Amino acid sequence: MLERSEPDTALAYSRYDPDIRRTISFRLLEKQRDLKLLWRWMNQAHVVPQWKMAKPIEDIAAYIDINLADPHQDPYIGLIDGTPMSYWEAYWAKDDVLGRYYPAEKKDRGWHMLVGEPSFFGRGIAPAVIRAFTRFLFLDDPGTQKVVGEPSVAARRLLRYAPACAFEEQGEIDLPDKRAKLMFCYRERFIQQFGL
């Protein structure tokens, strides 16, 4: 059985979602607190094909160190009603490898994510958590007019949710590690559909 984490005083985002009748929150990843959790998630059978991080805990610790030291991105843990369930990496697209594949603006943001807890699959919450993280990025910097994504063409489930989250397909691109769909979510369209 999943346990709620200890109460968080440093949530970066927290909002009740009436569509799923649950509270969605995000907090910065903390290495000491989250290492075993992220290691377990990276080794889940449903995560391995996309992330390719089924590695010893020492490798995940090094991965966390690199991400925490990287000024172009921030790692987050996603929670539903206080229970950790997902991992997110928010990045500045212009400073990311993706920024070489389209004319990135200075304030464009992007994210990578995984749902680590299998018990959260098939519950109809994926669009809600995607919208919540996208909203968080728009709120985090009012200058951000576009949130971008580059899911693998093989990530059919994630691609299926894109239109319900105001993401529009821009075409396919060949990144160093995958063939991907370039996706844009514009602030104005997001606000029209979901508000901030």
Curated annotation (Swiss-Prot):
Gene3D superfamilies: 3.40.630.30. One of its GO terms (molecular function) is N-acyltransferase activity. The keyword Hydrolase does not apply. The keyword Nucleotide-binding does not apply. Pathway: Siderophore biosynthesis; rhizobactin biosynthesis. InterPro entries: Acyl_CoA_acyltransferase, Acyltransferase_MbtK/IucB-like. GO terms for biological process: rhizobactin 1021 biosynthetic process; siderophore biosynthetic process. Keywords: Plasmid. Pfam families: Acetyltransf_8. Belongs to the IucB family. This is Rhizobactin siderophore biosynthesis protein RhbD. The lineage of its organism: Bacteria, Pseudomonadati, Pseudomonadota, Alphaproteobacteria, Hyphomicrobiales. The gene is rhbD.
